[in-house]
Design a protein with these regions (language model features):
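Conserved small/polar residues in nucleotide/adenosyl-binding loops
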Residues: 159-164
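CE4/NodB-like, metal-dependent polysaccharide N-deacetylase domain
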Residues: 100-133, 137-140
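Short, solvent-exposed turn/loop segments enriched in Gly/Ser/Thr/Pro and often Arg
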Residues: 50-60, 86-88, 122-131, 149-155
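Acidic, His- and aromatic-enriched active-site or binding-groove loops in soluble protein domains
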Residues: 67-82, 135, 139-155
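N-terminal catalytic cores of secreted or lumenal carbohydrate-active enzymes
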Residues: 1-98, 102, 111
């Protein structure tokens, strides 16, 4: 009998450049994300968390240094994964390949400097498409691939579904 194993890893995506202010990100969304995931890590021994964007880690380091130290401890024990490779999530359709490459370089350099670990993929959870140059950029950056959660936007309506 063939058995298969599925691995699920929790993640959070914070848009620091979209619909709310940096102050909201720093004062509301970062503390909420950290406290909930710190609690889950402590409660569940197999819980692992992916968090992306070196810029958000810089904000944590600046505004919540004790939490940043806790993240470092979790990274060392493989409970927390600096994900995504990029400094900041952004569009990958319009910017030049050079801009995307530098974004990856800045992000992974930060991860290595702070955690002695680099991300192995580019995490694009909220893009409105993926440019044709992306596979070459990913390959040239030495990444294994990319992860996403949104392959289309608004193409499926779930309004007819009801909860039990």
């Amino acid at each position: 009998m063939l058995t298969k194993t599925a691995y699920m890893v929790a993640t959070a995506h914070l848009d620091t450049v979209w619909r709310w202010t940096i102050a909201d990100t720093v004062e509301k969304f970062i503390p909420d994300t950290l406290s909930k995931n710190f609690d889950l890590i402590e409660k569940y021994p197999n819980y692992m968390f992916n968090f992306e964007g070196a810029y958000r880690y810089e904000l944590i380091e600046e505004y919540y240094p004790r939490a940043f130290d806790q993240i470092r401890r979790y990274v060392k024990t493989n409970r927390w994964n600096p994900a995504g490779s990029e400094y900041e999530n952004g569009d990958v359709n319009i910017p030049s390949p050079e801009a995307i490459t530098r974004n990856i370089l800045l992000g992974n350099n930060y991860f290595y400097e702070k955690f002695k670990k680099k991300s192995k993929d580019i995490f694009l959870p909220d893009c409105f498409g993926f440019g044709a140059q992306l596979p070459q950029i990913i390959n040239d950056a030495g990444l294994l691939g990319f992860s996403t959660q949104k392959l289309s936007w608004g193409s499926v309506s779930y309004t007819h579904l009801t909860l039990p």
